[in-house]
Amino acid sequence: MQKLIMGNWKMNGNSTSIKELCSGISQVQYDTSRVAIAVFPSSVYVKEVISQLPEKVGVGLQNITFYDDGAYTGEISARMLEDIGCDYLLIGHSERRSLFAESDEDVFKKLNKIIDTTITPVVCIGESLDDRKSGKLKQVLATQLSLILENLSVEQLAKVVIAYEPVWAIGTGVVASLEQIQETHQFIRSLLAKVDERLAKNIKIVYGGSLKAENAKDILSLPDVDGGLIGGASLKAAEFNEIINQANKICTE
């Protein structure tokens, strides 16, 4: 299966640094049949990034509102996202859930606004360290996915990318063990299999949690890991490109 490598730039960068980053990423060579690339800049730089990257590199937004239009100061709608030429959308990132109190219902409502457009939604799920230690991992992940799996058709679900991000491993330098990553991805795939076996086999489940060049080969080689959602390492073109190179090599072996 084609690997999907995505960079979440979060609230980082300025016009100068982003131009340098785009220039660096534009240099990486990879087989587009084996690897797909996407980046998520801050919304004010999306148009700049689209114009500065090769067409083969997808560009997405980090968040939208679930309203269509109207008096919602500061918000961005799904229609606007499509209008400016975005390819991807992050939904439910752990920082949105923890810092802005986004609920599973909010995540579903945002997904519902985007699911029938040309934009690929990347739905983020993950557990806290307390959840894992108390044995609630499976319960938490199943709950986070329940509204989505119960209310979308198989055809709609097939458009979704799922990003598993253990909250305790994001931005901390702590990485889940390979066994933990594989077991969790396998569990997520088993939830999807209850809906449809073919869906479970073909849907992309990517890992996000301190993934970097030094551990990319091991993580991306796991059988149920279809790519990565990279944070800090995606802000350095050389490191992000090395992760892309590792993914490309894995898919050619």
From Swiss-Prot:
Keyword terms of this UniProt record: Cytoplasm, Gluconeogenesis, Glycolysis, Isomerase
Q: Which compartments is it annotated to reside in? A: Cytoplasm
GO terms assigned for molecular function: triose-phosphate isomerase activity
This one is known as: Triosephosphate isomerase
Task: Please list the reactions this protein catalyses.
Answer: D-glyceraldehyde 3-phosphate = dihydroxyacetone phosphate
Q: Which NCBIfam families match?
A: tim
Q: Which GO terms describe its cellular component?
A: cytosol
Q: In which pathway does it act?
A: Carbohydrate biosynthesis; gluconeogenesis; Carbohydrate degradation; glycolysis; D-glyceraldehyde 3-phosphate from glycerone phosphate: step 1/1
Which PANTHER family does this UniProt record tie to the protein?
TRIOSEPHOSPHATE ISOMERASE
Which residues hold substrate?
8-10, 171, 210, 231-232
Name the Gene3D superfamilies on file: Aldolase class I
InterPro entries xrefs = Aldolase_TIM, TIM_sf, TrioseP_Isoase_bac/euk, Triosephosphate_isomerase, Triosephosphate_isomerase_AS
Similarity-based family: Belongs to the triosephosphate isomerase family.
Specify whether Cytoplasm is a keyword of the entry: yes
Record flagged with keyword Membrane: no
* Protein purpose: Involved in the gluconeogenesis. Catalyzes stereospecifically the conversion of dihydroxyacetone phosphate (DHAP) to D-glyceraldehyde-3-phosphate (G3P).
Superkingdom, according to UniProt?
A: Bacteria
**Active-site residues annotated for this sequence:** 93 (electrophile), 165 (proton acceptor)
- Which organism does this record belong to? Francisella tularensis subsp. holarctica (strain LVS)
Which enzyme type, at the first EC level? isomerase
Supply the EC number(s). 5.3.1.1
Show the PROSITE patterns listed in the entry. Answer: TIM_1 (PS00171), TIM_2 (PS51440)
